[in-house]
Amino acid sequence: MTRDELEKRNVGENLDALMNLDPRGYGVCRILYAGSRAYTGEPLTMHAAQVLCDAVKENDLVYIITGFVLLPHKVPEMDGTVSSMLLARALVMAFGAKPVIVCPADSVQAIEKCAAVVGLHIYEDLDIVQTLPLSMGVAAFTKSLADAPAQ
């Protein structure tokens, strides 16, 4: 193993350990991590980064699914939303990609407000997204089983 390979592995191990902190003690993350790590054979953070570098090209649409609505208040959760927006910005800055956030309709307003904070312009029309710089899309999905086939 070269010094660069060792450094990459150690950075990945540290990032994976950080992302597997489980302050609530659910244990689910560690179970899912173990299976995923066995599948990839390397730190998941570095594996994901390499897959993105290999796959994402300029102007590619990259779909990011996020968000759920907290009941009974009907407000969107925000930790996944914020993380998704930061990923969207990183994809634009690193690759010139065109991220599209796919979320429940109740989360669209939060996504739109976060877009401005991360310096991106947001549109529902993906044709517009593909023609403008620093832009991203948002696509709401229905929670209605009856409406889902039409969407």
Where are these regions (language model features)?
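Acidic, glycine-rich active-site loops and adjacent beta-strand->loop/helix elements
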Residues: 68-70, 105-109
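Short, charged beta->alpha transition segments
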Residues: 45-55, 87, 113, 140-145
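Short internal beta-strands
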Residues: 98-106
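Short, glycine-rich nucleotide/cofactor-binding loops
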Residues: 36-42, 61-62, 66-83
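A general structural motif
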Residues: 59-61, 96, 149-150
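Histidine-anchored nucleotide/phosphate-binding helix
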Residues: 77-96
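An acidic, phosphate/nucleotide-engaging active-site surface
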Residues: 111-151
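Positively charged, low-complexity intrinsically disordered leader regions
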Residues: 1-61
